[in-house]
Amino acid sequence: MIKTPRPRLCRRVGFQPGTTYFKPAGIRMTELKESVLLVDEFEAVRLKDLLGLEQEECAVKMRISQPTFHRLILSARRKIADAIVNGKAIRIEGGNYKIRAIKRLGWRHGKRV
C-alpha cells in the first residue's frame, strides 16, 4: 500500500496584494533573478510583522496550526531576506489559499444590523 501525503488545507487570507512585483532599482529585467513569495506567505508577514499579532492569533485567522504558521513565516522571511541581500525581485503569486469573507452590514427584519 502506497502512503499518500495528507492534502494541504486551504489557508485563509484577509488581504489580496495590489502590487505583486517588487524590483530593485538599477538592475535590468533581463539580468534579474526572482524570489516567489506565495500569497499565504505574504499574509503571514502582514499579520505578524505589519499588524504585530501573536503567532497563535495569526494561525487562528489563517485557519492553520501554530507550527504550520511558524514554518510559513520562516519561509517568507527567508525569501524576502534572499531577495534584499542578493538583489532579486520579489513576485507575489500562487499558494493554497482562499480570501477570507468580509463581514458587511446587513438588514434584518427591516432594521440595519
For each feature predicted by the language model, list its residue ranges.
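C-terminal flanking helix
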Residues: 77-84
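The alpha-helix within a helix-turn-helix
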Residues: 48, 59
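Short, Lys/Arg-enriched N-terminal segment that forms or immediately precedes the first helix
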Residues: 18-33
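Short alpha-helical "packing" element that flanks the helix-turn-helix/winged-helix DNA-binding module
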Residues: 41-45
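Helix-turn-helix/homeodomain-like alpha-helical modules used for DNA recognition
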Residues: 98-113
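Residues within the DNA-recognition helix of helix-turn-helix
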Residues: 72-75
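Helix-turn-helix DNA-binding motif, specifically the short coil turn and the N-cap/start of the second
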Residues: 54, 63-67
